[in-house]
Amino acid sequence: MTPQPPLSAAGLPYRQGVGIMLINARGQVFVARRLDSPEAWQMPQGGIDAGEDPETAAWREMEEEIGTRNALLLGETAGWLGYDLPEELRGRLWGGRFQGQRQKWFAFRFTGQDADINLATAHPEFDAWRWVDVDTLVALIVPFKRPVYEQVVAELAGFAVPQPA
């Protein structure tokens, strides 16, 4: 079970979610471009359903967003990482019910082939994807999420190393 989200200064709660750092055998990280915002690249992420634990949510979100579960769990962030939505997005996303998100992030080793990744899922969120070096990741991300991505990289980049052939 996840803890109750705290209220923000604006009086709105934070949405509880998970994020996924999917790492290929070359030590590169998966990023995808959002359908609703072509300038926005991100790693897969999503909400935690009622009664769902964060790890289960991460596996579900991976399959829902990129069409695969071909992965091995490597680790997770020590705590929850959060961001506030910019004012101009707060009223549009999630019906204006949340100030931002608090997320538990997980590192996974991708064990499949690139052909296993399928963005044409039941509810597509992305229209393109690629593998990037971890040191270029943060620069691709929308500014309001960058501090979280910096923390994710600081905690999980140690898993982003090439694997022996």
UniProtKB/Swiss-Prot annotation:
Cysteine disulfide partners in this protein: none
This protein's record includes keyword Hydrolase: yes
InterPro entries attached to this UniProt entry: Nudix_hydrolase, NUDIX_hydrolase-like_dom_sf, NUDIX_hydrolase_CS, NUDIX_hydrolase_dom, RppH
State the superkingdom. Answer: Bacteria
What cofactor does this protein call for?
Answer: a divalent metal cation
Q: Which GO terms describe its molecular function?
A: bis(5'-adenosyl)-pentaphosphatase activity; guanosine-3',5'-bis(diphosphate) 3'-diphosphatase activity
Record's keyword terms, sorted? Hydrolase
Gene Ontology biological process terms from the UniProt entry = nucleoside phosphate metabolic process; ribose phosphate metabolic process
Short motif (Nudix box): ranges = 46-67
Q: Which PANTHER family match?
A: NUDIX HYDROLASE 26, CHLOROPLASTIC (PTHR11839:SF22), UDP/ADP-SUGAR PYROPHOSPHATASE (PTHR11839)
NCBIfam families (alphabetical): PRK00714.1-3, PRK00714.1-4, PRK00714.1-5
Q: What is this protein called?
A: RNA pyrophosphohydrolase
